Amino acid sequence: MRLTDYTDYALRVLMYVGAQAGRLVTIQEIAINHGISKNHLTKVVHRLGLAGLVQTVRGRSGGVRLARDPATITVGSVVRLTEPDFIMVECFDEARNTCSLSPVCVLKHALGRATGAYLQELDRISLASVLPGAGGARMTGA
């Protein structure tokens, strides 16, 4: 299973902002520190804001900061928010499934259990546990 760049960027934003101890961080700062397009990050931050994970403040002195305690944000919840679907194989999508093996396929159920276990493990990882000081890499601010 591979996560999209969108999810990767969302996790990076949350980790970077979470490491700033409530300081407002500009999207430009995050973009520069991670080598990511500011325009793309703007979309990511907007989505995180709509989900109540970050607070955005407009204006000259504006920026982004966490809207919740990082201990209450799980990697699993972020992945579910930002990934378009978890359709690993065609038969996971009933509307598009044309596989003739589907009615008797055991693999479909095994893959479904594996996906569930993957997400369950990600639900055990809080944002707080991956921030600097919790074993994470040091992140610098401007």
Residue ranges and their predicted role:
Residues 3-5, 11-36, 55:
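N-terminal helix-turn-helix DNA-binding core of bacterial DNA-binding proteins
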Residues 32, 49-50:
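Alpha-helical residues within the helix-turn-helix
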Residues 39:
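Key DNA-contact positions within bacterial/archaeal DNA-binding proteins
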Residues 52-67:
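Beta-hairpin "wing" of winged helix-turn-helix
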Residues 63-80:
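Charged, amphipathic alpha-helical coiled-coil/dimerization segments
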Residues 74-75, 93-142:
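C-terminal regulatory/oligomerization modules of transcriptional regulators
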